[in-house]
Amino acid sequence: MNRTLKATAAIMLMMVFAVGCGKQPMKPQKQAPEGAVDGLFSINENKQVYFSQGNLQYQPSSNTWQFAWNQYDCIDRNDYIVIDENYDEWIDAFAWGTSGNNHGAVCYQPWSNSENDADYFAYGDSVANLYDHTGQADWGYNRIRNGGNQTGQWRTLTKDEWEYIFDKRTTTSGARFAHAVVNNAFGIILFPDDWDPTVYSFVEVNKKKIFSPFITNVISETDWNALHYQYGLVLLPIYQRGCAYWSSSYNDKNDEYGLNCAFEMSTLPGFIFVGTNEYRHNKCYVRLVQDAD
């Protein structure tokens, strides 16, 4: 097939996708900040946020933070590798409050490996959240090279905000989230507040437990790129064995976990648990947000 025919075929394929999905005329751009997905998500009755374009990543040897270039990107973790300040690969799972800023915790470096949960008290305070005091315990305080590269632009969602996104948001379509397999990666799709359900057909919407996660909402890379670039869908990728995303809130419940834990959003294929506990020393993903004006 010559170049002209290839180009014609590509254009026809794009037209088929647009018609097949019931695609509407391109909606006005929201002018999302650098490094953000162009969709708005309510975190309470009066406030919206943009999600970052991917999970947070860090390279110890260069002290560099960045967002994953694709929403479905996860770094295959090897628990037997010793990570220190000289490690020259990227990591994307962190103990709680390990922003790299010396905010008062014993362990504040992103590569910290202590299994003593008290070493990760934000600001050295057992009852402090990441956003308390100077805010420097939050990973979003850092310069992120593909996210505006300024301090204090991003932040981690609180426990209550995670719960609002999954359970309480009022959206145009009524859809808030769905399990999916995107480009062979398992994940949770979050629909923006103004999602139009005629654009693409999703099943098992707003269900935290499903029975066929491996064949539910299977989306190719091509279709996903068209959806998330224009319509602002967010994907929270997960490992097949499960993973968790940190909140900025410490565990303020008087339960058996006590102050050793912070709150998280955890998931495995087919299951979602919001507002659960995770020991502070455990390594979890971080997905940052930026407040909308």
Model features per residue range: what roles?
Residues M1-A9:
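Bacterial N-terminal signal peptides that target proteins for export
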Residues A9-A18:
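Bacterial N-terminal signal peptides
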Residues A18-G39, P237:
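Bacterial Sec-dependent N-terminal signal peptides
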Residues V19, W69, G174-A175:
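Generic alpha-helical propensity signal that fires on short helical segments
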Residues Q31, G39, N46, Q53-P60, ...:
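C-terminal, surface-exposed recognition/capping segments
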Residues D38-Y131, T156, D160-I165:
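A short glycine-rich, aromatic-capped structural motif
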